[in-house]
Swiss-Prot record:
It comes from Thermotoga neapolitana (strain ATCC 49049 / DSM 4359 / NBRC 107923 / NS-E). It comes from the Bacteria. Its EC number is 1.1.1.267. This is 1-deoxy-D-xylulose 5-phosphate reductoisomerase. 1-deoxy-D-xylulose 5-phosphate binds at residues 116, 142-143, 163, 186, 199, 204-205, 208. One of its GO terms (biological process) is isopentenyl diphosphate biosynthetic process, methylerythritol 4-phosphate pathway involved in terpenoid biosynthetic process. Pathway: Isoprenoid biosynthesis; isopentenyl diphosphate biosynthesis via DXP pathway; isopentenyl diphosphate from 1-deoxy-D-xylulose 5-phosphate: step 1/6. InterPro entries: DXP_reductoisomerase, DXP_reductoisomerase_C, DXP_reductoisomerase_N, DXPR_C, DXPR_C_sf, NAD(P)-bd_dom_sf. Belongs to the DXR family. NCBIfam families: Dxr (TIGR00243). Gene3D superfamilies: 1.10.1740.10, NAD(P)-binding Rossmann-like Domain. NADPH binds at residues 12-15, 39, 115, 117, 192.
Length: 375
């Protein structure tokens, strides 16, 4: 069987390194290019182990190795154009992933999407590119991977599951003052810091609802979210005739990663026992997760969705640095949305980036104000 070529963008992050774990277990895929931001030592180890020949460095760091090193403002696009890989795993986190996704769609045959912000902020740009190019877009998020596997043309509703985050059992009055150490103890998954905080606020699940609208072309009303404590059911499809499809698996991101790489085939990663299974589904409490319910305000506006993401980036960073309390995160987002509301809808990438930059500035001012009154 002919080897397929793979580029991993954001290789040193959580999804990137777990993709490498999958590559160690499967055959038929050769890693030809990577990008990373600042983790030089890990990048060097990856280049050596996988004999990577092309590296994009997006951070302001010095990097020397046996591979060709691409630098500069268009390095990622230039490498992608030169390699034209069969598969690109977009594991870049944050808003910068939007440019990475568009470059991957332009130059790859399949894009494995692990970046939420690209669809939240630039879904219209992604769908525009998909119409222009003959390229597959396969979701990597466990919830969207699950729905992708069982969805049918006619669905009554889909259900995305949520763990509820580290504070799901805390008294409501104590949540306000939770510390980063409290929040980073996720009950199910092992993830990066920002996404773990976003899980506790359920901003992450708000992103995933918006992603599902884009990926599956579903109206907001057909997407539901339930708290599922066991972390075993990742997606549910409810059909008009009363049938319900669910995807069960251990909470291991290597499962959806491998599926996105090998689709429609599957990797042999292990078995799953049904003997001791217990599952539960609970509604989302608006008092516990106020940021999640901002979805109703932002769902139909890419400008507000972009501002929502920008404000969350700023607020989570401030929380992790001890500048604001946990309860301040949703307040930063709310006040930023108030100031962005009424902005014209973006029509291209540059306008999305302008809104994101402006929203970040607003959120930073709100954060400074909150910090000053709480200190």
């Amino acid at each position: 069987m002919e080897e397929r070529t793979l580029v991993i963008l954001g290789v040193t992050g959580s999804i990137g390194t777990q993709t490498l774990d999958v590559l160690r277990k499967i055959e038929g895929i050769r890693l030809v290019g990577i990008s990373f931001h600042t983790n030089v030592e890990l990048a060097k180890k990856i280049v050596k182990e996988f004999q990577v020949e092309n590296v994009v460095v997006t951070g302001d760091v010095s990097f020397e190795c046996s591979a060709k090193v691409w630098k500069g403002p268009h390095a990622l696009e230039d490498m992608m154009e030169a390699l034209k890989p069969d598969i690109t795993m977009v594991a870049v986190s944050g808003f910068s992933g939007l440019r990475a996704v568009l470059a991957a769609l332009e130059h790859s045959r399949r894009v494995c999407l692990a970046n939420k912000e690209s669809l939240v902020c630039g879904g219209f740009l992604v769908k525009r590119k998909l119409k222009e190019k003959s390229v597959e877009l396969i979701p990597v998020d466990s919830e969207h991977s699950a729905i992708f596997q069982v969805i049918e043309p006619d669905v009554q509703k889909i259900v995305l599951t949520a763990s509820g985050g580290a504070l799901r059992d805390w008294d409501l009055e104590k949540i306000e003052t939770a510390t980063p150490n409290d929040v980073l103890k996720h009950p199910v998954w092992s993830m990066g810091a920002r996404i773990t905080v976003d899980s506790a606020t359920m901003v992450n699940k708000a992103f995933e609802v918006l992603e599902a609208m884009e990926l599956f072309d579903l109206p907001f009303e057909k997407i539901d979210v339930k708290i599922h404590r066991e972390g075993l059911v990742h997606g549910v499809v409810i059909l008009p005739d009363g049938n319900v499809k669910m995807v069960f698996s251990p909470p291991d991101m290597r499962i959806p990663i491998s599926y996105s790489l090998l689709y429609p085939k599957r990797a042999a990663l292990g078995s799953f026992s049904l003997e001791t299974m217990k599952i539960s589904f609970d509604p989302v409490n608006p008092e516990r997760y106020p940021a999640f319910f901002l979805l109703n305000q932002i769902k139909d506006s890419y400008a507000l969705r972009t501002a929502f993401n920008a404000a969350d980036e700023v607020a989570v960073d401030a929380f992790l640095k001890g500048k604001i309390k946990f309860g301040g995160i949703h307040r930063v987002i709310e006040r930023t949305l108030e100031r962005i509301d009424g902005y014209p809808e973006p029509e291209n990438l540059e306008e999305v980036e302008q809104i994101h930059d402006e929203a970040r500035k607003i959120a930073e001012r709100v954060t400074e104000w909150l910090s000053s009154i709480s200190s």
